[in-house]
Amino acid sequence: MDKKNINNVKLGKDVKIFDFVNLYGCTIGDNTKVGTFVEIQKNAFIGRNCKISSHSFICEGVHIEDNVFVGHNVTFINDRIPRATNEDGGMQDESDW
């Protein structure tokens, strides 16, 4: 049984990824550690020498610089990039709210 869900991810050298993660479409820099039960979404960027502690959620578009520690159960939210669409299929923006 595969305990990691990793799809379309750019991994640097010596990256350590623990079990029960969901990583897709993101970039993770050299010597970074990703703990258990972490989700990192598409277009997120994690720098070099970082530690992403367990149960953390890093949403689309988040950019984490080098040498950053993200503590246990940290959640980044994304209220700048809307996920809803208009009737024509285009993305909603501030004027739609």
Stretches with model-predicted labels:
Residues 1-10, 19-97:
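Flexible, glycine/small-residue-enriched loop-and-beta-strand segment within the central core
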